């Protein structure tokens, strides 16, 4: 084949892949610059069905794609060049695999003759993501390989996929055609003649039926299950599962609804949101120990107390409802797992429990904690929990919330306020890393343009400083609230042997502030040390069309001392 034909065929294959991905539901493509991925990049540049997002750092790019996929509820494509560019996606791919988020990596690669021989920027890319992605290895584009074969390969890998896919794309040089003009996918091209019908339509070449199989109990099984004292525990649920339906289910059965930070129901007035704290409240815990049936929606519970409660209780019946076949119970309880969305399971023919309202006193205990937190957090000293509660109480219907790992998400789980409504809430709790949190929030903010708040710790923000470049490009509100306690002060809550070891090897104090970082990326910045100033800055930031930073500086021990004091009060109640 002439070299010019090589460049053209490379481009045609890139265009076929991206066109088919668009037909399979992809709305966004995230791209990092690089030469070996040129056929994909040039095809993406001409693809009108995809929104393009560019960033120079592949690690941040992967997490931005993760955020876009979470917010759009659709697969997102990622284009990278060869070499370590691909490896930099690994953390985001791990998180996506564990939380069933569909990312599609399109990695440019060297042809076989340039692998394992010292060629530049060439590593073994197939299988680079190990168990965390479905692997597809494409050959170098070849006129003898029918375009239909390429499309069916993409279709089989991507259709109905809820987890990452890695499509490795080998290309020989030349990569750059001499000119770009006209349609890449020309119906008059002899090579594309077999695809004339496909080119005229808007559907995938291969159309797969939905593969999810739902399972549900019989009416008789439901009747037996609800005959006793039970609780409903709600773990991580995505917004599209319509968790609000579980409120009605709880009220119909007459069992309390115990909600995790990631349930979309943590602040709902009809839920028992303070369950983490109630499990150290003596009277509440004694009451909860009477339960002999549990219905768990989702998994990846945040509270160790709730996890211990589920593990230690002697359950007569334990049901768990998951949207996919998965094993999400580190305590390995004997149980029956049903495959359904929360909304679908709540719509079954449920009966009133014979022990309905058995735990109504929990409402009183939950209210007691609500008043305790108002007095001791909202009206107490300025600190991390106070800021988190203020954010959770501010315009929840107007915005979406991304809560960072380590201390922020635990403070929200322990102390989030009861509210009329809850902002749509996102976390990265698959692998629970502190990497890529800002980039993920940028992806969430970029999809719809809805105001978004990120609550992030100082070490997490330092870890993802490059992603301020993504934030700079946003045209919708993203409020980056940095809780700066000068290090990893979650370790104040853990039994590290002594204070010197804690300081030298765990907390890693840095003495840094973020004003110059904000200035470097030309982002609005405020540093606050009291609640009134925070509220003013926060409301202003929610109305600003772009990203802005609010830095909250607190002492290293503020949050841990407050947690200890509140724990003591709860235990003595």
Swiss-Prot record:
Its EC number is 2.2.1.9. Its cofactor is Mg(2+); Mn(2+); thiamine diphosphate. Keywords: Magnesium, Manganese, Menaquinone biosynthesis, Metal-binding, Thiamine pyrophosphate, Transferase. Gene3D superfamilies: 3.40.50.970, TPP-binding domain. The keyword NADP does not apply. One of its GO terms (biological process) is menaquinone biosynthetic process. Homodimer. Catalyzes the thiamine diphosphate-dependent decarboxylation of 2-oxoglutarate and the subsequent addition of the resulting succinic semialdehyde-thiamine pyrophosphate anion to isochorismate to yield 2-succinyl-5-enolpyruvyl-6-hydroxy-3-cyclohexene-1-carboxylate (SEPHCHC). This is 2-succinyl-5-enolpyruvyl-6-hydroxy-3-cyclohexene-1-carboxylate synthase. It comes from Shewanella baltica (strain OS185).
């Amino acid at each position: 084949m002439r070299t010019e034909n090589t460049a053209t065929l490379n481009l045609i294959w890139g265009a076929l892949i991206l066109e088919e991905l668009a037909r399979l539901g992809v709305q966004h493509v995230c791209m990092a610059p690089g030469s070996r991925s040129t056929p994909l990049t040039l095809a993406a540049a001409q693809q009108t069905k995809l929104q393009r997002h560019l960033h120079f750092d592949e690690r941040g790019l992967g997490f931005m794609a993760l955020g876009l996929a979470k917010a759009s509820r659709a697969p997102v494509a990622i284009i990278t060049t060869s070499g370590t560019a691909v490896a930099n996606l690994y953390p985001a791919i791990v998180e996506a695999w564990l939380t069933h988020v569909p990312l599609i990596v399109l990695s440019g690669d060297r042809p076989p003759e340039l692998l394992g021989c010292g060629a530049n920027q060439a590593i073994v890319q197939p299988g680079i993501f190990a168990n965390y992605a479905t692997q597809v290895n494409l050959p170098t584009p070849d006129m003898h390989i029918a375009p239909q074969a390429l499309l069916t390969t993409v279709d089989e890998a991507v259709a109905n996929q809820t987890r990452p896919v890695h499509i490795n794309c080998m290309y020989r040089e030349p990569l750059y055609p001499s000119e770009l003009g006209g349609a890449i996918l020309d119906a008059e091209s002899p090579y594309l003649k077999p695809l004339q019908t496909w080119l005229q339509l808007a559907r995938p070449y291969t159309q797969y039926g939905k593969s999810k199989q739902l399972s549900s109990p019989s009416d008789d099984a439901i009747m037996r299950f609800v005959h006793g004292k039970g609780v409903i525990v709600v773990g991580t649920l995505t917004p599209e599962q319509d968790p609000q339906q579980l409120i009605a289910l709880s009220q119909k059965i007459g069992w309390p609804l115990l909600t995790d930070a990631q349930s979309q129901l943590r602040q709902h007035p009809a839920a028992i949101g303070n369950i983490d704290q109630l499990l150290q409240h003596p009277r509440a815990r004694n009451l909860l120990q009477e339960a002999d049936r549990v219905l768990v929606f989702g998994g990846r519970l945040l509270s160790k107390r709730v996890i211990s409660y589920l593990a230690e209780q002697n359950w007569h019946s334990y049901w768990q409802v998951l949207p996919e076949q998965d094993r999400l119970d580190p305590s390995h309880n004997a149980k029956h797992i049903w495959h359904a969305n929360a909304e679908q399971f709540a719509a079954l023919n449920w009966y009133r429990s014979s022990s309905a309202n058995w735990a109504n006193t929990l409402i009183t205990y939950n209210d007691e904690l609500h008043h305790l937190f108002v007095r001791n957090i909202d009206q107490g000293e300025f600190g991390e929990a106070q800021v988190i509660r203020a954010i959770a109480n501010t315009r929840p219907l107007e915005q979406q919330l991304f809560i960072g790992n380590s201390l922020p998400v635990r403070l929200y789980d322990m102390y989030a306020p009861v509210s009329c409504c809850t902002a749509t809430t996102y976390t990265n709790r698959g692998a629970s890393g502190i990497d890529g949190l800002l980039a993920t929030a940028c992806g969430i903010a970029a999809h719809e343009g809805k105001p978004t708040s990120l609550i992030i710790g100082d070490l997490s923000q330092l870890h993802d400083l490059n992603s301020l470049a993504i934030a700079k490009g946003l045209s919708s509100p993203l409020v980056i609230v940095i809780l700066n306690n000068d290090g990893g002060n979650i370790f104040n809550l853990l039994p590290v042997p002594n204070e010197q070891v804690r300081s030298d090897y765990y907390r890693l104090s840095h003495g840094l502030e973020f004003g110059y970082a904000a200035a470097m990326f030309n982002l609005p910045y405020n540093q606050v040390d009291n609640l009134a100033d925070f509220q003013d800055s926060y409301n202003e930031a929610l109305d600003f069309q772009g990203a802005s930073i609010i830095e909250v500086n607190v002492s290293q021990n503020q949050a841990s001392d407050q947690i200890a004091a509140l724990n003591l009060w709860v235990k003595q109640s």
